[in-house]
Amino acid sequence: MQHEHTEHVAAPPDAVYGAIADVTNLPRFVPQMTAVRRSDADRVEVDARYEGREQHGEVSFTADELARRIEWSAPSGYRGWMQVDQDGAGSRLTLFLETLHGAESDHDIAATLDAIRMLVESEV
């Protein structure tokens, strides 16, 4: 299942990109994540709580500062990206997500984007 959502953020693109590229921020805008640690330059370890169960996994995570884009993928087929573009005086943040099992809902994805927007706008 594929999802794509876009949200305007009233902050400069570099500020939005900085927030999403810092993996330690993930638990601040993805409520299911409880901890994130970088294991090497392109991989992160993630602790999360889904459907009442604690889960631990490692995912690839790359950040392209010039393109203001992050990408991630897990062995389970879960993958996605976020892209930040200039949008007038602010930014346009797009999130794309692909899952094999349809676990994520459009509401959850929209809530994640909204949490990022609130986080970044409160800090600029």
Residue ranges, per PLM feature:
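Short, surface-exposed coil-to-beta transition loops
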Residues: 2-4, 54-58, 77-81
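Hydrophobic pocket/interface hotspot
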Residues: 16-20, 26, 44-46, 61, ...
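Short beta-strand-to-loop capping motifs
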Residues: 9-11, 48, 97-99
